[in-house]
Amino acid sequence: MKFTTLATIASTLLFAANANADTCNPLKSSDCSPVPALGSSFLEKFDNGLGPHFESLKKQGTIDSGSNGLSLTMKKRFDNPSFKSNFYIMFGRVEVVLKGAEGKGIVSSFYLQSDDLDEIDIEMFGGDPYQWQSNYFIKGNTATYDRGGYHDIANPLKDYHTYVIDWTKDAVTWSVDGSVIRTIPKDNAQGFPQSPMAIYAGIWAGGDPSNQPGTIDWAGGITDYSQAPFTMGIKSVLVADYSSGKQYSYSDQSGSWESIKADGGKVNGRYDQAQDDIKKLESGQSVDSNDSSSSPSASSSDSSSTSSASSSSSSSSPSSTTSSSSSSSSSSSSSSSSSSEKSNAVPSASVIVFIGTKGGDKTTVTSSSGVSVPTSASVSTAAGTTSGSANSAPASAASSTASTVFISTGDAAPSSSASEKPSVSTTENNGAVSVAKTTSLFGFVALIGFLFV
């Protein structure tokens, strides 16, 4: 029995090491493989599953589809239904029609994230019916949480709104229902996201009682699971890649957009074409499918989804998302910056080893794959230009001022006690760290040695 138990633990540690090895940060390695480019435009209405461009992260919870798009539902603690794109865009426009989930401490997330941890976020909080949050991170830097902005909106948890992220080499702009809400210029003091990004969406419990106080406050309070189910809706997603080609790669480790190479295409090479595509798709027309040869899916993928007639700018359709990476992180240690995957509580060692870090005077928790959520309350000052919000409503006094993201990785069942979560403590370190992989490997070697003592 002892041998079996140790062997099982050893295998899970090895699995964790291998899982971490699959994630390659181009700023830390010059051997990262190119990522698949979209290189085209499409509109997905999710009337028959996730469609050809998205894939489930296979977390607990349910993702249902129908005439009203997707429903991502948490039925119990540790659920974290979430999905991601099977392509990347290099500058582009993403429109999502969504409705956030109701429920104190429940976070509905939709965001873009790159392999070197640039990130652009849209988040809603189930206990705040008056606001949504825009946020961004640069190269996984979570030393401060002053990039987030809170914006008034009417009924984001009951009504569907169209949220737009327009990302160019010069600025990032968030819009809601046709009105510009916030703009971040490329030369802002906090830095600028400029590397190929995938799309993530999901719902998770930031208010799980095992999370750190800062995370719970940010999410809006302790989650009451007796009020489940919690459901976020996503009716449609329109994506237009501003670059062309079959795949994107990093030519050096600078992380600048000028270092990105487009195989068979050009960075920013289809901006004008994308604008035409967007107009057609929003008006219910199809777009030229010739670009779809650049898509990671079969050439028919774009033609099938782009022919969908739903207008992504319509505020009447639902849409919702999640932290990739955002899976619910019931333990603040299980949350990781928007890379979407995970459940509300602490995962077992078979999933990943989480690293506790400190940034300034705030303790944060990150995973090796992404940024982190705040673990102690902090005041944020939104950078960038904020416009008057569409459908303004009184701001909720209960809204937290801590702004940040989420996410965690892993599939295994969470441990029952926060004290059981594996962690390694470091200081003055932010962004994705590779300690998890090293920790898992050392643990594996130690266990193997123990077996033969």
Swiss-Prot record:
Sites where a glycan is attached: N290
Pro-piece positions: 431-453
Annotated disulfide bonds: C24-C32
Localization (cell): Secreted, Cell wall; Membrane
Domain GH16: 28-227
Listed Low complexity bias regions: 286-343, 363-397, 412-425
SUPFAM superfamilies found in the cross-reference section: Concanavalin A-like lectins/glucanases
A Pfam family annotated for this UniProt entry: Glyco_hydro_16
Matching Gene3D superfamilies: 2.60.120.200
Gene Ontology biological-process entries: carbohydrate metabolic process; chitin metabolic process; fungal-type cell wall organization
CDD domains for the chain: GH16_fungal_CRH1_transglycosylase (cd02183)
InterPro entries with a match to the protein in the record: ConA-like_dom_sf, GH16, Glyco_hydro_16_CRH1_prd, Glycosyl_Hydrlase_16
Reactions catalysed: Random endo-hydrolysis of N-acetyl-beta-D-glucosaminide (1->4)-beta-linkages in chitin and chitodextrins
Signal peptide bounds: 1-21
This protein's GO CC annotations: cell surface; extracellular region; extracellular vesicle; fungal-type cell wall; hyphal cell wall; plasma membrane; side of membrane; yeast-form cell wall
Active site, UniProt feature: E119, E123
Recorded phenotype for the gene knockout or disruption: Leads to increased susceptibility to cell wall-perturbing agents.
Swiss-Prot/TrEMBL keywords: Cell wall, Cell wall biogenesis/degradation, Disulfide bond, Glycoprotein, Glycosidase, Glycosyltransferase, GPI-anchor, Hydrolase, Lipoprotein, Membrane, Secreted, Signal, Transferase, Virulence
Protein name per its UniProtKB record: Crh-like protein CRH11
Organism from which the protein derives: Candida albicans (strain SC5314 / ATCC MYA-2876)
